[in-house]
């Protein structure tokens, strides 16, 4: 059983929940968060226990790990919303993550769910994890995108256009002139579709993401992660997918 960590262990008995404050502000402020030697993920204790048992400090270390390892823009993340235990963190929905961290929220949610399902093995192959996350995540959330921090707090999904893989697939289905027989509807009303030309789809997505090494195996792995978020639903047929309850824009009467 982990030692319990009270709110006063790291924080003063004053209200600090400023909506504009990022968690990195507190990492750099010893009044709130005493300095500690940063460890690599595999050397850190929090990586060896289930996220539900993380203390608040472990949650902070996890956030720092995500920003360092996957080049997330820390200015997007509101520390106020992550001053919680691991159990509370695991109880957050994807929508709550996006409310707390803007476009980075979906990225953080995906990483957490991967750690919960894979355990310590998640940290054994960081390059493979990065490749999968790159296929899945919103690239506008990366530091290298040059996006301004205030833009990270805009939660409008319409501005993302086709930066997500599932949106790219949706838009391709809705654009016969660009589709070229790569995808086809099996049941338009139910949102069920089939990948007809798998490698052509992977090549087209790779060109958009400037990734010459994209394969359908990698692309399909990224698509399967959408099962966890309700964007796609599993269909027990090869190369067949279905839009889920959290997908939008594919219905004919809601375009």
From Swiss-Prot:
Subcellular location: Nucleus
DNA-binding region: 163-244
Keywords per UniProt: Activator, DNA-binding, Nucleus, Transcription, Transcription regulation
GO MF terms, alphabetically ordered: DNA-binding transcription factor activity, RNA polymerase II-specific; sequence-specific DNA binding
Gene3D superfamilies in the record: Transcription Factor, Ets-1 (1.10.150.50), Winged helix-like DNA-binding domain superfamily/Winged helix DNA-binding domain (1.10.10.10)
GO CC terms, sorted: nucleus
Domain PNT, residue spans: 33-119
GO BP term (any one): cell differentiation
Superkingdom of this protein's organism: Eukaryota
Major location (coarse): nucleus
UniProt function note: Transcriptionally activator that may play a role in regulating the later stages of keratinocytes terminal differentiation. Binds to DNA sequences containing the consensus nucleotide core sequence GGA[AT].
Domain notes: The PNT domain acts as a transcriptional activator.
Similarity remark: Belongs to the ETS family.
Name of the protein this chain belongs to: ETS-related transcription factor Elf-5
Protein species of origin: Bos taurus
Gene: ELF5
């Amino acid at each position: 059983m982990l030692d319990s960590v009270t709110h006063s262990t790291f924080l003063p008995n004053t209200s600090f929940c400023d909506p504009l404050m990022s968690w990195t502000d507190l990492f750099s402020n010893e009044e709130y968060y005493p300095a500690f030697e940063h460890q690599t993920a595999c050397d850190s204790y929090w990586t060896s226990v289930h996220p539900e048992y993380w203390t608040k400090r472990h949650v902070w270390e996890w956030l720092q790990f995500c920003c360092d390892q996957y080049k997330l823009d820390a200015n997007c993340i509101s520390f106020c919303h992550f001053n919680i235990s691991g159990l509370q963190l695991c109880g957050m929905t994807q929508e709550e993550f996006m409310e707390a961290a803007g476009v980075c929220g979906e990225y953080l949610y995906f990483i957490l769910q991967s750690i919960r399902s894979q355990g310590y093995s998640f940290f054994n192959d960081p390059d493979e994890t990065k490749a999968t996350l790159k296929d899945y995540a919103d690239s506008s959330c990366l530091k290298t995108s040059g996006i301004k921090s205030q833009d990270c707090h805009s939660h409008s999904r319409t501005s993302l256009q086709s930066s997500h893989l599932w949106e790219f697939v949706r838009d391709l289905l809705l654009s016969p002139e660009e589709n070229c027989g790569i995808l086809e509807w099996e049941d338009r009303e139910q949102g069920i579709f089939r990948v007809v030309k798998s490698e052509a789809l992977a090549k087209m997505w790779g060109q958009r993401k400037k990734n010459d090494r994209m394969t359908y195996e990698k692309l399909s792995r990224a698509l399967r992660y959408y099962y966890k978020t309700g964007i796609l639903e599993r269909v027990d047929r090869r190369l067949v997918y279905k839009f889920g309850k959290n997908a939008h824009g594919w219905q004919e009467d809601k375009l």
